């Protein structure tokens, strides 16, 4: 058995996907995940039908190919046979819940990443469904994250080793679970996740609406809170791409010594001065959500010269992610004061990247003991609240205590402030090129996702 005294099961999983299943809960096609932006044409159609501003007002999100609704419509248009057999759309965690309990449910946090959810009323939006000619019956039943979907069935118990009847607490999307795991459970507290993708978010009693629609809103695991958020697509992905594409030597040497190749790259970064010799990296390998909302955007190095060295390239990648995150941070600071950020995720390991980010933000970063496990911890706390083991979500702060604080260095402020402005100018200058390349990829039949 997995455990002889299971108290509850709950989940954290990727958000904004689209998995159509039949009445038995069997997938009708592979899930279209959050990073897949194939539904660009569907996004444009949605904007025509609803209006970008109205969509943002209802859902707390821009209308975008990144979200579930555009993916659903893509399937309806391009895979009609699958659409005819469609019973429910599920997210990743909801599919597992269905397997364990036989129930087709989702929680408010995952629903808030569909472009179909009324963020204030916490219900599927009749206005949007009507505009898109969608039936609410295609969508799962809505619940708070702490609701119990049901008990583990006998068949699921035999397949998994879980105890039959174990309560299955619905849990939430990884963004909302990370918020709880980071201890961001009080109004105004904020955090940064530095993972494959990256986001900055805070806890708020009300959704926050950016006049330029650069940020968006999830529902917190606590149904009385929201998590206004800005997310970039390729943070850790940028570092992973760079390692795989340009650091074969470091990978081979690391394999010989048993250390992480990132440790070797990070040591080299210390040989490049802050600012990477005036080299900029634009981290748009997967297009971009906030702050740019441009699925055609792509990555670039700007400022290469004959004096550019390998360590400058390495530093520029980490700094470029930091500049992009600062755009998100500053848009959120317009609405709420933030004096410090909790830092979690794989990028929080070591000192190199956290120190670069602290300098670019000119803000302290607090690092908890469980920096890589925060999302699963958030789901575990949700399970505890759901079955009554914990009184409320404040338990997360007791479990995941602060073990380190990275302070910004004043001597790097001017350098990074200036490069941050140039970074934004570089993006603006390349927007036309991104559009032309997007049209080229479409004309040549190359994949957008």
Question: Where would I find each of the regions flagged by the language model?
Answer:
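Short, acidic, Ser/Thr-enriched surface-loop or helix-capping motifs
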Residues: 22-23
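Short, small-residue-biased leader/transition segments that mark boundaries at the very start
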Residues: 2-4
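Active-site core segments that coordinate phosphate-bearing ligands/cofactors
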Residues: 40, 47-62, 66-105, 115-133, ...
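Carbohydrate-associated surface elements
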Residues: 36
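Short, small/polar residue-rich loop motifs at catalytic or cofactor-binding pockets
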Residues: 13-15
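Acidic/charged, solvent-exposed loop-and-adjacent secondary-structure segments enriched in E/D, K/R, S/T
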Residues: 9
């Amino acid at each position: 058995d997995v455990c002889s005294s299971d108290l509850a099961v709950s989940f954290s999983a990727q958000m904004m996907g689209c998995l159509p299943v039949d009445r038995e809960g069997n997938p009708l096609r592979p899930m279209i995940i959050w990073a897949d932006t194939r539904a660009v044409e569907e996004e444009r159609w949605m904007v025509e039908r609803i209006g970008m501003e109205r969509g943002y007002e209802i859902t707390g999100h821009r209308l975008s190919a990144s979200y579930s609704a555009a993916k659903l419509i893509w399937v309806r248009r391009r895979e009609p046979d699958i659409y005819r057999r469609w019973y429910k759309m599920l997210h990743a965690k909801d599919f597992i819940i269905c397997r364990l309990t036989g129930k087709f449910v989702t929680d408010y946090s995952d629903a808030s990443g569909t472009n179909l959810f009324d963020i204030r009323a916490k219900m599927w939006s009749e206005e949007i469904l009507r505009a898109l000619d969608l039936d609410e019956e295609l969508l799962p039943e809505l619940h708070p994250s702490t609701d119990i979907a049901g008990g583990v069935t006998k068949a699921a118990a035999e397949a998994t080793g879980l105890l039959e009847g174990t309560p299955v607490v619905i849990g939430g999307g990884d963004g909302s679970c990370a918020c709880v795991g980071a201890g961001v459970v009080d109004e105004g507290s904020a955090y940064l996740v530095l993972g494959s993708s990256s986001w900055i978010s805070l806890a708020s009693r009300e959704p926050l609406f950016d006049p330029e629609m650069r940020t968006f809103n999830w529902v917190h695991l606590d149904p009385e809170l929201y998590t206004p958020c800005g997310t970039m697509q390729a943070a850790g992905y940028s570092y992973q791409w760079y390692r795989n594409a340009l650091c074969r030597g470091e990978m081979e040497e690391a394999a010989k010594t048993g250390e992480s190749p990132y440790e070797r790259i990070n040591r080299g970064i210390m040989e490049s001065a802050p600012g990477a010799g005036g080299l900029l990296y634009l981290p748009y390998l997967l297009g971009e959500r906030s702050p740019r909302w441009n699925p055609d955007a792509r990555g670039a190095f700007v400022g290469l010269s004959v004096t550019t060295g390998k360590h400058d390239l390495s530093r520029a990648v980490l700094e470029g992610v930091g500049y992009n995150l600062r755009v998100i941070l500053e848009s959120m600071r317009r609405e709420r004061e933030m004096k410090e950020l909790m830092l979690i995720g794989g990028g929080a390991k070591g000192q190199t990247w956290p120190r670069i980010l602290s300098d670019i933000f000119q803000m302290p970063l607090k690092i908890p003991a469980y920096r890589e496990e925060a999302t699963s911890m958030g789901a575990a706390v949700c399970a505890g609240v759901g079955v009554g083991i914990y009184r409320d979500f404040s338990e997360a702060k007791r479990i995941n205590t602060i073990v380190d604080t990275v302070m910004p260095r004043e001597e790097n402020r001017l350098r990074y402030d200036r490069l941050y402005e140039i970074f934004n100018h570089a993006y603006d200058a390349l927007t036309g090129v991104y559009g032309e390349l997007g049209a080229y990829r479409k004309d040549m039949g190359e994949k957008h996702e």
